[in-house]
Amino acid sequence: MSISALGGRTKGKPLPPGEEERNNVLKQMKVRTTLKGDKSWITKQDESEGRTIELPSGRSRATSFSSAGEVPKPRPPSTRAPTGYIIRGVFTKPIDSSSQPQQQFPKANGTPKSAASLVRTANAGPPRPSSSGYKMTTEDYKKLAPYNIRRSSTSGDTEEEEEEEVVPFSSDEQKRRSEAASGVLRRTAPREHSYVLSAAKKSTGPTQETQAPFIAKRVEVVEEDGPSEKSQDPPALARSTPGSNSADGGRTKASRAIWIECLPSMPSPAGSQELSSRGEEIVRLQILTPRAGLRLVAPDVEGMRSSPGNKDKEAPCSRELQRDLAGEEAFRAPNTDAARSSAQLSDGNVGSGATGSRPEGLAAVDIGSERGSSSATSVSAVPADRKSNSTAAQEDAKADPKGALADYEGKDVATRVGEAWQERPGAPRGGQGDPAVPAQQPADPSTPERQSSPSGSEQLVRRESCGSSVLTDFEGKDVATKVGEAWQDRPGAPRGGQGDPAVPTQQPADPSTPEQQNSPSGSEQFVRRESCTSRVRSPSSCMVTVTVTATSEQPHIYIPAPASELDSSSTTKGILFVKEYVNASEVSSGKPVSARYSNVSSIEDSFAMEKKPPCGSTPYSERTTGGICTYCNREIRDCPKITLEHLGICCHEYCFKCGICSKPMGDLLDQIFIHRDTIHCGKCYEKLF
């Protein structure tokens, strides 16, 4: 039934209102869809009806206004696609509508553009590849869109439009854009440069100028807060090449390394290393892997150590290291341990299993001896917030009272260190004919060291201010330290004062734990941290889960003690919980394994060791036998012991309790709250608020 029939039939009879509306809607829809099969009526047009019928005439009408030169060009595309295009992401209306703006545009300019365009397009052929939308503003593009449709298949018209857009560029405009692009270049990564450059007009002059500064002859990775310290020696920076990395020839494996060297002379031969760099601290920050592990290689800590002036230099370096790695500036004091500075913070996989890549990161203060001993203990880790987890494989500095302390700093890294700690072959151990070594030992009084005496007697070496013992301090921040490190002495390295090349006692004994090996004579010693001498960096929220494993043949002392080393100069207090287990059977067998699990619930890392309670400085015999429990006043023998050093609490694990409700807290060290120097359990602490 046709609409007319429908309308005619219903004219005489009154229709219900709903039917009337329905008929109106049907009528409108039928008319529009019949006449406008392309559905272009959806876009608002003045001549909504009858347009399809008039399309040919409409086209001729449209073209009649435009110049003769333009007539042949629009026609072929328009006949093929009357419904519209999407060009460069902009939907363009059908030809009939686009012809209307086109009629006005040439007249708006006052002259038909086609004549000019024909002239221009003749010489516009070469620039055609550069016809890109970058040069147009949005408004200009909207004006051009209709013409782009019609000229899309023609060779010259797009260039014509491009040319018209390019012409307005004055030299000032070009200079302004080039400067803007070069400004962006300075701030963006190299991979983005090409894109940015394309934004400016590609004229060779300015572009080359802007690119020139980016050819980096040396990239110095320095935090803004501490550039001066790191750039102590610009020449050293220049020297920081892979060749210099391989001071021992073994470090050449560190590719992609950016070295930041603090001190001028870097000894290249291993043998001359100790003597030559004696007054000089070379602390190189090596960025070894994309994971941003920084490796502080202190090849000559001895040199650093030998002169007091160097110590001051070391401190800044170590501080910067900490700042760079942990983003913190905790280590301000010049007396920062060389342990810190020389701690080699290398990414976990840096030296893994490669003797050659043995990074020398003896973070030992008196590393000079070990340095001399050429034991490169590489400490690979990412430093926890300025808490240097000093995990040092304590190598037996047998007759050498000064040993090495390596700082192992792990920041949340579950440090899968995979490092092979190896001693350099043939390098005499400190104290064995290395003159630099003895001078260095006393240099840093505040570093703990552990000393193994060749006599085989278990002896406790306290961390005296002279620091003549090597302390292996392992602090991990949430590190459950999977330290896959094989500490090996390379064969033929005579032990300090021992001269026994066959004493490679540090074998990759336990890949998952830092080990301290005492001399084969089985002399075991315990290192005590003297209150006055040791600096504790209290690791902020440092939970160390250390697996303590001793290989049967060699005595190892694992003291992963999170008692972090801090500058004693700092004033703020840190809270250090030490839960210490001493296995009497192993002690008697010459293998004291003291794993100190510490959970530091205070984020303040400044903890002055002077506040250490007397129990901290009791001799080893007393510590193994005990100390006096703060709560029950009985001796602490072989039981687990809990020490809160700044509160003066030293007690049995089972005696440790909440100071308010007396709830046993020995197994709840992670739920301790200290308020006004009183231990609170979680519930009592909540009641305070």
Curated annotation (Swiss-Prot):
Modification sites for Phosphothreonine: 447
Comp. bias intervals (Low complexity): 373-382, 434-444
Tissue specificity as recorded in UniProt: Expressed in placenta, pancreas and kidney. Also expressed in prostate, testis, ovary and blood.
Molecular function terms, GO-annotated: zinc ion binding
InterPro entries for the chain: Cell_Prolif/Cornif_Regul, Znf_LIM
UniProt keyword Zinc, yes or no: yes
Polar residues bias locations: 95-114, 338-349, 448-458, 504-524
Protein name: Zinc finger protein 185
Source species taxonomy: Eukaryota, Metazoa, Chordata, Craniata, Vertebrata
